[in-house]
């Protein structure tokens, strides 16, 4: 999910964007424009379809301010990577440590409630969702094969 950033104490905003991604496509739902349709609620509650993300507790709390639902089969990558002994739980660091590639988080603090999302926001939101799937699949494979080694560097980063 993406929410308009807060810059003043006591201010809060509702979730503006929900990303739903597969391996090849990502759909961006502008919840601030369309509300939460019943098909999205059904997806959120579906226990057969895994929903993968990072720090999902925060997302669940924010989504519940918009609509009440019973979460079904959510997989939080933060819990998964802790099984590997990885301590830095940010998406950017996880992706860099596992894939040795960098992803930009520059658009994270942009206005997700704007009339139109610009191409950079769209790319950021889609990448954010797709990255979680990619990490999940890779970590699942590594867990099954045991083909990884945790390496600590001088910076205390953990690399798989």
Description of each model-found segment:
Residues 133-160:
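Acidic two-metal-ion nuclease catalytic site recognized across multiple nuclease folds
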């Amino acid at each position: 999910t993406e929410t308009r950033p807060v810059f003043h104490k006591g201010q809060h905003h509702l979730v503006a964007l929900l990303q739903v991604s597969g391996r090849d496509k990502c759909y961006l739902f502008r919840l601030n424009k369309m509300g939460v349709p019943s098909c999205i609620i059904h997806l959120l509650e579906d226990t057969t379809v895994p929903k993968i993300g990072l720090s999902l507790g925060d997302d669940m709390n924010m989504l519940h301010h918009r609509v009440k639902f019973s979460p079904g089969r959510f997989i939080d990558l933060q819990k998964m990577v802790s099984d590997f002994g990885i301590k830095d739980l940010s998406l950017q660091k996880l992706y860099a440590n596992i894939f040795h590639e960098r992803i930009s988080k520059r658009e994270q603090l942009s206005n997700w409630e704007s009339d139109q999302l610009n191409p950079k926001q769209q790319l950021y939101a889609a990448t954010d969702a797709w990255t979680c799937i990619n990490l999940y699949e890779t970590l699942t494979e590594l867990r099954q094969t045991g083909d990884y080694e945790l390496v600590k560097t001088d910076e205390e980063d953990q690399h798989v």
